[in-house]
């Protein structure tokens, strides 16, 4: 279930939607289903795509205040749903973009407000690993231990080998999105 960072309605001008997440959880429990809550957007964007909430902008990771805010949102989601029967788990961040995807994906669009895009870049691996450790600790502290904490590979699958085990993380899952529509761009870039 994709949710935005303003899910609780505390970021103007956006209205929240937490009542719909509550409803989805109620329905899931009523009908024996499980919900994976996926934090799909962050303030300032994590991938520069529309599904990250703001096209052409990717600079959330450069703003410590917004990074802390996202951890706070995850904590609140974990507190609210971490003991619910209908929760499968929480995915901490949808599709943080890698350097290669940021530069070469064919559908990358320009920001409507070019000024807002200033400072945008890919999400560095070092930052992502640090953020994932913090998100894990934040969620694990407030959720039942059998609930999954899910991490997107950031389009860098091979870079996660042993990371979760070496970090001592339990009951985690790595989410991988394979988009064949970008394959030609990558092949052409690597094999001109």
Locate predicted features.
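Structural recognition of the beta-strand scaffold that forms the well-ordered cores
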Residues: 1-2, 7, 35-37, 41, ...
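Short acidic/His/Gly/Ser-rich catalytic and metal-binding motifs that mark active-site loops
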Residues: 7-10, 43-52, 99-102, 184-186
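Extracellular glycoside hydrolase catalytic/binding regions
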Residues: 72, 86, 93-192
